[in-house]
Amino acid sequence: MTSETRTLYSQLPAIDRLLHDSAFLSLCDQYGHTQVVDLLRRMLDDARDVIRNTQTLPDWCADWAQEANLRLEKAAQSALRPVINLTGTVLHTNLGRAWQAQEAIDAVMQAMRAPVTLEYDLDGAGRGHRDRALATLLCRITGAEDACIVNNNAAAVLLMLAATASGKEVVVSRGELVEIGGAFRIPDVMRQAGCTLHEVGTTNRTHAKDYRQAVNENTGLLMKVHTSNYSIEGFTKAVEEAELAEIGRELDIPVVADLGSGSLVDLSQYGLPKEPMPQQLIAAGVSLVSFSGDKLLGGPQAGIIVGKKAMIAQLQSHPLKRALRADKMTLAALEATLRLYLHPEALSEKLPTLRLLTRSEASIREQAQRLQARLVARYGDEFTLEVKPCLSQIGSGSLPVDRLPSAAMTFTPHDGRGSRLEALAAHWRTLPVPIIGRIYDGRLWLDMRCLEDESRFMEMMLK
């Protein structure tokens, strides 16, 4: 060790001395003595590494309290940070999918603050069933005989198969063997559930006779899977749920359907593309229908199964149900969300997902133009700011082909360098409330469809 290195080491302060400083006393009050001491030890190690490698002190050694405060603030940030989603994808899987309605938020807060009647029957003063209240609501909305709630739709599909067809064959069209995000594949789920996949038809064409010919003494289910995240077009043929349900009745084999997204209202009345509805499948005679809570329904993450009472009873009594059941916060949020559907006239106002999906292009463009004018002074020296038409997407595998006309604020660097766009996007991601856009065609696009809190957006953009 050189004398210069020894001199630099000697300039590093002792932890005890730092802890008596008023700034560190304040940090100890805020973050706790243990956490501050642990941090100071790491900072000393960092400083020694810099000295050893560069023969200099780190710049932050000039103000240990300031550096400690910055590091503690960063460490204290939640891993689930609120962001401003301007990607153009409304139900963005990586950003948490559906926003919750205020009614759902209030219900969750109430469920967290005090004991609730999760599995308690007030009338009988004994044990109740956690799905009962929601089952009543779901039956009212969908026309089903009963319902079952689990923690997501993948779990719902697994439970349906395991409880009703384990050890048996499940007949599915080749064109419906979907894979969703995270490599969730229908054939893999069947294998995990103990079922044997029996493919029928071809990728683009499946006929009623294909299902009939596939049935044998070991057939447990006929299954329909809604291809919510892709579309097969052209020379195609598929057997609709009503026809498949008729085949099932004729052959005395239950028919189940995985809708994926699942919408409880006819979206076409709001000018949106039509999506299959659980109530339509129930009316057609499908025995069990599963769908998600946090996609088009606009609620919390949940897997919902509606259908025949006897088959729902099979699901409720299966050992997997306990492993996959939803907790009280999820059930509270889902119940509050479902109650909004009892007042359909106000649904597009109260349900954030529907409110965002139904925003008009004109209102989005007006908002973008108004905010752009206020941001030119901040960004105009380096970027050209324009408002351009764009197409939003629903996201989370819902209506993959359809796009929603929207408007975006775009940033184009004067010098044409893509690195400036990357740097700007990276800067926005470091903000206290990160702003997430997308880079495309030499511009950084901020699709304004999902922007509701303008004041917070402007506060972040002007930093």
Swiss-Prot record:
Which top EC class is named for this enzyme in its record? transferase
Its annotated compartments are: Cytoplasm
Query: What cofactor does this chain's UniProt record say it requires?
Result: pyridoxal 5'-phosphate
- Coiled-coil stretches, from where to where? none
GO cellular component assignments: cytoplasm
Alphabetized Pfam families for the sequence: Se-cys_synth_N, SelA
What is its pathway? Aminoacyl-tRNA biosynthesis; selenocysteinyl-tRNA(Sec) biosynthesis; selenocysteinyl-tRNA(Sec) from L-seryl-tRNA(Sec) (bacterial route): step 1/1
Reaction catalysed?
A: L-seryl-tRNA(Sec) + selenophosphate + H(+) = L-selenocysteinyl-tRNA(Sec) + phosphate
GO MF, any single term: L-seryl-tRNA(Sec) selenium transferase activity
- Report the EC number(s), separated by commas if there are several: 2.9.1.1
Question: What GO terms in the biological process aspect are recorded for it?
Answer: conversion of seryl-tRNAsec to selenocys-tRNAsec; selenocysteine incorporation
- Family statement: Belongs to the SelA family.
What quaternary structure, including any partners, is listed in this protein's UniProt entry? Homodecamer; pentamer of dimers. Binds only one seryl-tRNA(Sec) per dimer.
Protein name (database record): L-seryl-tRNA(Sec) selenium transferase
The organism is Salmonella arizonae (strain ATCC BAA-731 / CDC346-86 / RSK2980)
Q: What is the lineage of its organism?
A: Bacteria, Pseudomonadati, Pseudomonadota, Gammaproteobacteria, Enterobacterales
Q: Per UniProt, what is the name of the gene that codes for the protein in this document?
A: selA
